[in-house]
Amino acid sequence: MTSGAPDLLIDAGNSRIKWALVTADGSQIAAGALPHSGADQPDWSDLPTPCRAWLSNVAGENVAARIAASLDARWPQLPLTTIRACAQQCGVTNSYTTPQALGSDRWAGMIGAHAAFLGEHLLIATFGTATTLEALRADGCFVGGLIAPGWSLMMRSLGEHTAQLPTLDAHAARGLLDGSIAAAGRSGPFFATDTPRSLSAGCTLAQAGLVERMWRDLQDEWQVPVRLVVSGGAVDEVASALKVPHTRHDSLVLSGLALIAAERALERGN
């Protein structure tokens, strides 16, 4: 392995694993994703040997062990760095009371967003298993955030903890929405006329309402424009219900991992 070899970036979220092989300048050589469910392994068979692997893992020890085994099977003894949030990195300052308690995915995502929209105040909304919000000032100061149940989790919880409501999965709920909320938003409030649509639309609008409320509150507090950046597995559904301007970015965590890798390489003198 040479200093010019690419980095392998791995984002292990609660529902799936995303990865990318990138060069030192951030150019992507290859990328992929796979769910935690099932026995599938990442297809790294045709990839060149990376200099190091970088992992953000919020999915637990079993997933970490699975990733380590996959790496060792393809590239024995490849160095693996599992990132943790810290007080300051890549121009972002962490205001959490205990900086290391912040999820590594949120930390890497903020680093990626700060670099992608340099000089802008941001509200970052990620719609995954959990919905997370981060308020990030233009100077890189993360002032705090929120965590709520994600879109799919909201629907599943209602089905599992009530006697008569159906348990909707994401696939079924997407079919029920079918652009109806966005269309209704142009003509008036949306009220469904059957239980499954009431549930799917209600959870979608709950997500959108949270984001819109915090975006408006943040602009009122800071008295400056704030860019709303959205991402995550349920971004299509929730973004369709938003009535405020927003920008989509699908690779914030991987982008942040690339920046962390580059900063560490400079520190090592590579």
Swiss-Prot record:
Question: Any idea which positions bind ATP?
Answer: D11, A12, G13, N14, S15, R16, I17, K18, T129
Q: Which domain of life is it from?
A: Bacteria
Q: Which Pfam families match?
A: Pan_kinase (PF03309)
Q: What's a BP term from Gene Ontology annotated to this protein?
A: coenzyme A biosynthetic process
Reaction(s) catalysed by this chain, per the record, are: (R)-pantothenate + ATP = (R)-4'-phosphopantothenate + ADP + H(+)
ATP-binding recorded as keyword: yes
What are the names of the required cofactors? NH4(+); K(+)
- Is Nucleotide-binding a UniProt keyword of this protein? yes
- Active site at D105
The record, for InterPro entries, names: ATPase_NBD, Type_III_PanK
Q: Which family does it belong to?
A: Belongs to the type III pantothenate kinase family.
NCBIfam families per UniProt: baf, PRK13328.1-4
| Protein name in UniProt | Type III pantothenate kinase
Organism this protein belongs to: Paraburkholderia phytofirmans (strain DSM 17436 / LMG 22146 / PsJN)
Gene symbol here is coaX
